[in-house]
Design a protein with these regions (language model features):
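Short, low-complexity, glycine-enriched hydrophobic/amphipathic alpha-helices that associate
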Residues: 22-80
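Extracytoplasmic/secreted envelope proteins and their assembly/folding machinery
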Residues: 42, 58, 75-78, 82, ...
Length: 223
């Protein structure tokens, strides 16, 4: 395949995802993301979540038949999460699951101590994560743009760390969990009004296949 053919392949596959891939299920989209990769798909996914989360989704994708197998496994996990996490936004993209908890669900305003209701939600999530141990969990903290850049960065780090610490205390293996604080750098809405700022104050979880799941999927796919 030459450079021009690759260019149009990426554009075409990007268009499929952008229009919702009406003839494709979510597992088949996993194969598409892996094949197309890169900027075209990333731009589409990035409209639904922060760029950091979108990058994690793309970076974890292996595509092809193995990617479709992983996608089916993620479909099952996402369905279970949707049943018990009514206060979270759960998105299936490619071979990954992205969970978005708004600030008010987990923390008080400008706080990094988990609320009682947050602990209840995280307990439910931890039960599912333990049931499916062959995934990695990336926890990403975000703030709005009010306050100084340094303050917001530190707050986002503390919030991501608080969530990670709680999941570990709920017996989710520490080796599966990583955290990052993005501060105000990765908004999903405008910071010019209260509604937009509330959307930007969030914690995202990106759940991806670990190496064991990927190798098993490749073997099952005959790759």
């Amino acid at each position: 395949m030459n450079a021009i053919q690759r260019y149009f392949l990426v554009l075409s596959l990007g268009a499929l995802v952008a229009t919702g891939c009406k003839t494709m299920n979510r597992s088949q989209k996993g194969a598409v993301v892996g094949v197309a990769g890169g900027a075209a798909i990333g731009a589409v996914i990035g409209k639904k979540m922060g760029n950091t989360a979108a990058g994690a989704v793309i970076g974890a994708a292996i595509g092809g038949a193995a990617g479709s197998i992983i996608g089916k496994k993620m479909d099952k996990q996402a369905e279970e999460m949707e049943k018990v996490l009514g206060d979270a936004e759960i998105t299936r993209e490619g071979e990954s699951i992205v969970i978005n908890f708004k600030e008010k669900v987990l923390f008080g305003y400008d706080q990094s101590v988990l609320s009682n209701s947050a602990q209840t939600s995280l307990d439910k999530l931890a039960d599912i994560l333990e049931k499916y141990p062959d995934t990695d969990i990336r926890i990403i903290g975000h703030t709005d743009s009010k306050g100084s850049i340094r303050y917001n960065q530190n707050l986002s780090v503390r919030r991501a760390s608080a969530v990670a610490t709680y999941l570990r205390s709920a017996d989710v293996a520490s080796s599966r969990i990583s955290t990052i604080g993005m501060g105000e750098k990765d908004p999903v809405a405008t910071n010019d009004n209260d509604e937009g700022r509330a959307m930007n104050r969030r914690v995202e979880f990106v759940i991806t296949a670990n190496e064991k799941m990927k190798e098993e999927a490749k073997r099952d796919a005959g790759e």
